[in-house]
């Protein structure tokens, strides 16, 4: 579940070619201390855009889209700027977060009308307090991807984003049934360990794709050492993307690119 834009950029599956970037990649991967195959600086950078989140309102930022038309417009803008994946939360016209299958279907259809080859990744995090059934509703549309949150997090005050082990297994089984590729959303190292444990039990299939969400209240911070630690904690053959909350967004995105990850 996100309340922020994962990333914006002017690269649409473009290669990283800069000599300075290549040098930084070499240094960073040696700092990691664990080589996972040869570093290929020509791998494509995949950009994911979260265009509205579940909590941010127009009072916070007038550009936050609510209506189907606004969401499709922002998705097209992100796609034109370089996004290959749209991480999708949806709202009612008044801005109320919803996991309605019908609302997701309307938004997905509208997005596909203007950018047919973009990958749609609905959130199954929804908003704090939603039931499992509500959160899973968009998976019945069989999108290409969906988020799989792998642990519980204290978001602040009395808000707890609940994801028990049995819930995670239920969500993973649903995604397997519908042929959906999960983006494994992790807010701290313990959630990485949970995902690996469930992979070993057969609930999450390889190759695993992680999203390191850095700087969430109650989760791991968004300092360079934190991203190095997270990236060095996932199994060989996995892919990862990184997003930072608030002030951590640009530092984490920059470092993620230098490390050969996605954003």
Question: Which residue stretches match the model-derived regions?
Answer:
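Catalytic alpha/beta core domains of metabolic enzymes, predominantly
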Residues: 145-263
């Amino acid at each position: 579940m996100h309340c922020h834009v994962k990333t914006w950029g002017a690269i649409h599956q473009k290669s990283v070619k800069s000599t300075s970037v290549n040098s930084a990649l070499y240094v960073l991967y040696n700092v990691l201390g664990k080589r996972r195959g040869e570093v290929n600086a020509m791998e494509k950078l995949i950009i994911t855009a979260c265009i509205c989140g579940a909590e941010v309102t127009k009072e916070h930022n007038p550009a936050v889209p609510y209506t189907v038309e606004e969401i499709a417009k922002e998705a097209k803008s992100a796609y034109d700027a370089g996004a290959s994946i749209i991480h999708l939360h949806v709202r009612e016209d008044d801005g109320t977060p919803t996991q309605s299958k019908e609302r997701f279907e309307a938004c997905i259809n509208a997005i596909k009308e203007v950018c047919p080859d973009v990958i749609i990744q609905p959130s199954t995090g929804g908003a704090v307090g939603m039931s499992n059934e509500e959160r899973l509703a968009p998976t019945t549309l069989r999108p290409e991807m969906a988020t799989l949150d792998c642990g519980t997090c204290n978001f602040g005050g009395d808000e707890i984003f609940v994801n028990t082990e049995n819930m995670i297994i239920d969500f993973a089984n649903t995604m397997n049934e519908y042929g959906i590729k999960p983006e494994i959303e992790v807010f701290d190292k313990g959630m990485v360990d949970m995902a690996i444990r469930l992979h070993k039990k057969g609930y999450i299939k390889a190759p695993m794709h992680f999203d390191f969400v850095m700087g969430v209240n109650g989760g791991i911070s968004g300092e360079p050492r934190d991203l190095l630690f997270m990236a060095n904690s996932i199994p060989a053959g996995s892919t990862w993307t990184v997003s930072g909350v608030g002030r951590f967004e640009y530092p984490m995105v920059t470092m993620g690119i230098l490390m050969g990850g996605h954003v």
